[in-house]
Regions:
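Glycine-rich phosphate-binding loop of ATP-dependent small-molecule kinases
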Residues: 1-302
Length: 302
């Protein structure tokens, strides 16, 4: 029975680019030599620049996404209504967080967006409703030397939440198809390949029962400029503005093109993108909380 099981999984997972080799282990030394010879043969074949074996094409059911230039940014929420909705959403999220823990359902929330769009404040309001023992906010900076020595998704796998916990990523693996693409930190072949890699990554998360919610926080160039100047002119906010922010602003059009492609190619049925219109930060905060509530309820009700 055990032998049949081994044969079944080897047949199911054998592929031209990752094939199994059965070795007779009845004679230890002969088995070692055969394994070494097989490994040597495979390495030599790879070094001879063998064309990569064609992998099966994966299909990702994608949702339509409108270009950022067409997103309406005139939505607003008054202070009184904001306070009312904030209190209500916090109560619902707190209750859902407890239920997530009891049912051992992990949640991954991704925040991407323009500099000064309001990601930090949005995360702060969302996290204020959660039990501190059951969530983590993970700010993503440039990869370390050790992280660069591995596949770019490795450092995100390392930070995924335990069952029943919530991970909030302040920037994420999508840097591969934005900043790394535009700043030349990876080749065109690498960032083109990344769309399928990311879709596969998120598919594996949702297959395992993880709730995945992705936000793009949207503002216009004029709003960004006003917020940059406010940061420059406010002593307690000056730490938020850097020369890199100004350099990125000069590449607005290139970034917008990259983001449009990212949204179009990675907004899947299981892990869709949501646009947070954040010219009015209060509106964006409540919208984010409602979307998280809806995504969690949808999973818990299955």
């Amino acid at each position: 029975r055990t032998l049949d099981a081994f044969q079944d999984f080897m047949s199911a997972t054998d592929a031209p680019w990752a094939c199994w080799k059965a070795i007779d282990g009845s004679h230890a030394v002969r088995a070692q030599l055969e394994a070494a010879d097989w490994l040597y043969h495979q390495i030599c074949t790879a070094l001879d620049c063998r064309p990569a074996a064609e992998q099966p094409k994966r299909e990702w059911p994608l949702l339509p996404m409108e270009p950022l230039s067409q997103v309406r940014l005139d939505q607003a929420l008054g202070e009184k209504e904001y306070r009312k909705q904030l209190k209500k959403c916090r109560k619902e999220l707190a209750e859902l967080h407890n239920e997530l823990y009891r049912k051992k359902v992990p949640v991954v929330i991704v925040y991407e967006g323009w500099d000064a769009a309001g990601k930090g404040g949005n995360i702060k309001r969302l996290a204020s409703a959660l039990d501190p023992r059951g969530y983590e906010v993970i700010p993503i900076a440039a990869p370390t030397h050790d992280e660069l020595a591995r596949h770019y998704l490795w450092r995100f796998w390392e930070r995924l939440p335990k069952t029943g916990h919530i991970a909030i990523f302040d920037r994420s693996w999508y840097g591969r198809v934005m900043v790394e693409r535009l700043e030349g930190f990876c080749s065109e072949a690498e960032w083109q390949r990344a769309y399928d890699e990311i879709n596969e990554f998120e598919r594996e998360l949702t297959d395992a029962g993880t709730v995945v919610v992705k936000f793009w926080v949207q503002i216009d160039k004029d709003t960004q400029l006003a917020r940059f100047r406010e940061r420059q002119n406010t002593p307690e906010k000056q730490w938020k503005i850097t020369e890199e922010d100004w350099r990125n602003r000069e590449k607005w059009d290139a970034y917008e093109e990259a983001v449009d492609e990212m949204l179009a190619r990675t907004s899947t049925e299981r892990a869709p993108w949501h646009i947070l219109e954040s010219v009015d930060k209060r509106y964006a905060r409540i919208k984010a909380m409602r979307l998280v509530i809806g995504a969690i309820r949808q999973t818990l009700d299955r």
